[in-house]
């Protein structure tokens, strides 16, 4: 048992999906996993272990933002021996060519957070995905006929920005979307020499608000990224 996770060692698989929303973790467990068992309910951050196509996998919510995912991901890696972590979550498009319900595979994550500069104040440390996972996920998504974009994202500390034009300017530099967790996850993966990838569904188009989705849709209907995430986990065995 760790500080924030009530599981025993062995209760959690060495590969895991990490949605931000704990109810999305429950949805994945109930709709994709067989024989799923809940291993955590502390702070309402639900976690489950079951099997997917005969492979043992886990899924757990992380909450919103880099401090929250950093707590859970670190404990999963250090205390429970997790080796492969895939974030499945939502993002807002800032690229005019990226639309709602399409997938973004986060090849790299820029950030406006100081979470990494706390360790390296003198320079920028690039946050990158594991290429093997990225390659597998891309080909799985394409084979399934999903519209998929590969590129950088911005991991932001701020959801309601007072200067959205600064974020939108990044879209002109090839940044696909804004989210709130990938940079911290990639940094932890680099520290502990494990594999990590972010797979995002576009839930909001900051260039066209008419494309936005409801809270219920975000929780239960973005199944493409869930399928790609699970298939990537088992293909990585």
Curated annotation (Swiss-Prot):
Coiled coil: none annotated. It catalyses: a purine D-ribonucleoside + phosphate = a purine nucleobase + alpha-D-ribose 1-phosphate; a purine 2'-deoxy-D-ribonucleoside + phosphate = a purine nucleobase + 2-deoxy-alpha-D-ribose 1-phosphate. One of its GO terms (molecular function) is purine-nucleoside phosphorylase activity. GO terms for cellular component: cytosol. The active site is at residue 204. GO terms for biological process: purine nucleoside catabolic process. PROSITE patterns: PNP_UDP_1. The record marks 218 as: Important for catalytic activity. CDD domains: PNP_EcPNPI-like (cd09006). The keyword Glycosyltransferase applies. Phosphate binds at residues 20, 24, 43, 87-90. Keywords: Glycosyltransferase, Transferase. A purine D-ribonucleoside binds at residues 4, 179-181, 203-204. It holds the Pfam family PNP_UDP_1. Its EC number is 2.4.2.1. It comes from the Bacteria. Catalyzes the reversible phosphorolytic breakdown of the N-glycosidic bond in the beta-(deoxy)ribonucleoside molecules, with the formation of the corresponding free purine bases and pentose-1-phosphate. Belongs to the PNP/UDP phosphorylase family. HAMAP family: Pur_nucleosid_phosp (MF_01627). This is Purine nucleoside phosphorylase DeoD-type. It comes from Streptococcus uberis (strain ATCC BAA-854 / 0140J). The gene is deoD.
């Amino acid at each position: 048992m760790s500080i924030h996770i009530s599981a025993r060692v062995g209760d959690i698989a060495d590969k895991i999906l990490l949605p931000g929303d704990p109810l999305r973790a429950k949805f994945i467990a109930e709709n994709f996993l067989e024989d799923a068992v809940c291993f955590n309910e502390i702070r309402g951050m639900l976690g489950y272990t079951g099997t997917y196509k005969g492979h043992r996998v886990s899924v757990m919510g992380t909450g919103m933002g880099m401090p929250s995912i950093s707590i859970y991901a670190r404990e999963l890696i250090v205390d429970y021996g997790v080796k492969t972590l895939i974030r499945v979550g939502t993002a807002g498009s800032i690229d005019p060519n990226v639309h709602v319900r399409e997938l973004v595979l986060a090849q790299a994550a820029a950030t406006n957070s100081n979470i990494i500069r706390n360790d390296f104040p003198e320079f920028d440390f690039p946050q990158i995905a594991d290429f093997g996972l990225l390659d597998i996920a891309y080909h799985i998504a394409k084979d399934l006929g999903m519209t998929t974009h590969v590129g950088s994202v911005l991991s932001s500390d701020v959801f309601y920005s007072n200067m959205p034009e600064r974020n939108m300017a990044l879209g002109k530099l090839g940044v696909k979307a804004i989210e709130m967790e990938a940079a911290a996850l990639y940094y932890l993966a680099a520290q502990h020499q494990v594999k990590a990838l972010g797979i995002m569904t576009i839930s909001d188009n900051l260039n066209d608000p008419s494309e936005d989705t409801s809270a219920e849709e975000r929780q239960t209907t973005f199944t493409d990224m869930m399928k790609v995430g699970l298939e990537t986990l088992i293909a990585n065995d």
